[in-house]
Amino acid sequence: MDRKDFIKQMRSWQNGSITRREFLGRTGLGLAAAVVATQMPGLLTSKAYGADKAIGDRVVLATWPNYHNAENFAAFAEKTGAHVQMNVFGSNEEMLAKLQAGGSGWDLFVPTNYTISTYVELGLIEPLDLARLPNFDAASYEKRFMEQGIVDGKLYAVPKNWGTTGFVYDSDKIKSKPTSWKEFWELAKGDASGRVMVHDYQLTAIGNALKSFGYSFNSLDPKELADAEKLLLEVKPHLFAINSDYQPSMRNGDAWMSMCWTGDGSQLHRDLPNMQFTLGKEGGELWSDFFAIPKGAERPDAAYALINFLLDPQVNKLEVEAHGYPSGDKRVDALLPKAMLDDPIMYPAAELLSALEFGAAATLTSPERAELMARFKAA
């Protein structure tokens, strides 16, 4: 397989068209590393990230769909001998339940901002040793995208990426140019019946139903939740699927519209210009994701090495270019092409961002929201 074919397979994995297993089977990480070493030798000479000592043959990362650059993982494996094994999840509730159950096997994971205080309260994550993360520079990050990684004066998580939650639609199929969550739900019940996807994630599924009524994305008010539930139950028979990995169905035409995170919107629009990403005019979610290490992780040296490697600005630039999520690191922004910095999907106008809300910690463990989501999925 030549480099062109390898890159094609890598893109297919990144956009969700093939699984990680299929990617490895078709290419092999050895070949991947060879390509990276030849084409991007700078990746293999980053500031100390664990290459000076043995860190084992693998590192287990729990993360989200379509959220990493396979070439960077190959470069990391080539330099350290540790291959990255991914466990992919579609919600923070899933991640929390897995850690609470014990035996996750994770060495690091990617929680969202509003969940970190809960992980700390439950004793599920360790404070980070910044001496082992020389590529992390707190001064390079905007405060709002990193402050929730700090609990009681201790740093428990460092920023990975930030983004928004909107919806994506196929403009060849949906001609009305929707701009609101109200229109999203109306289309789901009407002209796009059978072709719409909703996240398998209570924060966004319930939150964006709430927004269509003008309520807070994080509402726990019983009446407001009842209104959201009524809407969700009305829509449920019309949905194509409830799934947080929606790129494959949007790409193959089974779905015409889906709740969508920034990077998925960027990837879809980049490859298929008819895919349009929209932030509902009522508002919605602004979020930031972090790297954290679970308490008792089996391979902490490998976890620190991988985090530090990915925080290298040159490496992080390649991450952003591949997945389309802003890093929040000014050093990385300075390396990105102007076309990306001007992309309104990645960097929405200030007035659009001002209408968005960060998720609230109380929603993660709210029994009312959990039960509502369970009824919605079971209907």
What would you call each of these model-derived segments?
Residues 49-118:
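Early extracytoplasmic/lumenal segment of secretory-pathway proteins
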